[in-house]
Amino acid sequence: MKNFLAQQGKITLILTALCVLIYLAQQLGFEDDIMYLMHYPAYEEQDSEVWRYISHTLVHLSNLHILFNLSWFFIFGGMIERTFGSVKLLMLYVVASAITGYVQNYVSGPAFFGLSGVVYAVLGYVFIRDKLNHHLFDLPEGFFTMLLVGIALGFISPLFGVEMGNAAHISGLIVGLIWGFIDSKLRKNSLE
């Protein structure tokens, strides 16, 4: 286990640890305080509280929610950090948090939490870099299909009483695909 964690990058570990610590604090009775301090800006006076544009990604609402998001982030965010460095992952995290939060807020208001918009950005980034850079990550066939199925499930989930941040998922995937495409083209141009 120690060796496994040693192979992970700092940003992957820090963001994962923050999510876990915040979730534990919620379970210990601090949920209302955490929700209030970390939700996306809901009122005009909160617009200048800049942490709110990313802090919503660190809060999770159930065991399954945090397990799903952190599993994907740990694996694929870790791939990005090991391959391209901590700064790349941190930049992708901050930009994807801000954009997916803005889009989800526009569509449904400020009552949303979780890392899934960032997770979809990470997955989109890894997918497009793998496709355009000769299987850089050696992803399995059907990876993109899995992403689309995940998004489709988000649209039918209300039928089962589960609400998902579909706007955050879709905008996150788009952010990751565009960023990965640009980085791939910049890499290709720098090699020519």
Curated annotation (Swiss-Prot):
The keyword Transmembrane helix applies. Its main location: membrane. It is found in: Cell inner membrane. The chain crosses the membrane at residues 11-31, 58-78, 83-103, 108-128, 142-162, 164-184. InterPro entries: Peptidase_S54_rhomboid_dom, Rhomboid-like_sf. The keyword Protease applies. It is a multi-pass membrane protein. This is Rhomboid protease GlpG. Its EC number is 3.4.21.105. One of its GO terms (biological process) is proteolysis. GO terms for molecular function: identical protein binding; serine-type endopeptidase activity. Residues 32-57, 104-107, 163 are periplasmic. Keywords: Cell inner membrane, Cell membrane, Hydrolase, Membrane, Protease, Serine protease, Transmembrane, Transmembrane helix. The lineage of its organism: Bacteria, Pseudomonadati, Pseudomonadota, Gammaproteobacteria, Pasteurellales. The active site is at 116 (nucleophile), 169. Gene3D superfamilies: Rhomboid-like. Rhomboid-type serine protease that catalyzes intramembrane proteolysis. GO terms for cellular component: plasma membrane. It catalyses: Cleaves type-1 transmembrane domains using a catalytic dyad composed of serine and histidine that are contributed by different transmembrane domains. It comes from Haemophilus influenzae (strain ATCC 51907 / DSM 11121 / KW20 / Rd).
